[in-house]
Amino acid sequence: KSKYEIQKLISEIAHQLRTPLANIKNYTELLQESLNETQETLNTEYIKDLRTSEEQLCFLVESFIKTARLEQGIIQVHTQKENLVETILNALGQIQKKAEEKEIFFQVELPEKIICEHDKNWMCEAFYNVFDNAVKYSKNNSRINITMKQTEMFYKIQVRDYGIGIRDGEENKIFQRFYRGEQARGQEGCGIGLYLSREIVLLQKGMMKAKQMKPGLLIEVNLPV
């Protein structure tokens, strides 16, 4: 009961933050529209920083809400036969802007079509978090590899970056809620993205695992054939 109450509290707090965050977003947009020509350069930099902070906070709040609701069973996955490749590419499209800002290139090797039983909305969320994690901890002007292979039991989607990676023994820990790897200290993030992704995958009878690379990290998402 205590765990449930804590989850409910987190969900409620996160939900209450939505309104002030929406106000910040709206006022930032209004401020940007009313820029004075003589102050345009300076104001643009301030607004850019403000919008970046607002986007990070929004992402954090939404992640808390989704995690709490999933754990409480308020939101459930609804699987049906969908094109898994399309789901992956949708998530990739959402992260493209962040990748471009760091001049990160995605090297994608996927088949044109794989029909797989999954919840396309939640799996898009799961893949987005994996891609976001890879971009976040990759160096500027680097690449991220995305590949897929099929075994007798699973579709294996691998996402390999060449970033800061993890230390020995952290392969399972990085999927724990709020866990931050030793290498990730000092970087933005709250340790909830990969946890949420794994929960989504587990609800669809799949599994996730991580492998230390030199350099970087490999995340593998397995979904049943």
Map each language-model feature to its residues.
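Short helix-loop "hinge" at the ATP-lid/N-box region of the Bergerat-fold HATPase_c
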Residues: A134-V135
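Short beta-strand/loop element within the Bergerat-fold HATPase_c
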Residues: N141-M153
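Conserved micro-motifs of the catalytic ATP-binding
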Residues: Q72-V77, I115-H118
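Short conserved segment of the HATPase_c
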Residues: I166-Y179
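Conserved glycine-rich
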Residues: K205-A210
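Short alpha-helical segment of the dimerization/phosphotransfer core of two-component systems
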Residues: T52-L57
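Conserved catalytic submotifs in the C-terminal HATPase_c
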Residues: H78-K81, E100, F105-I114
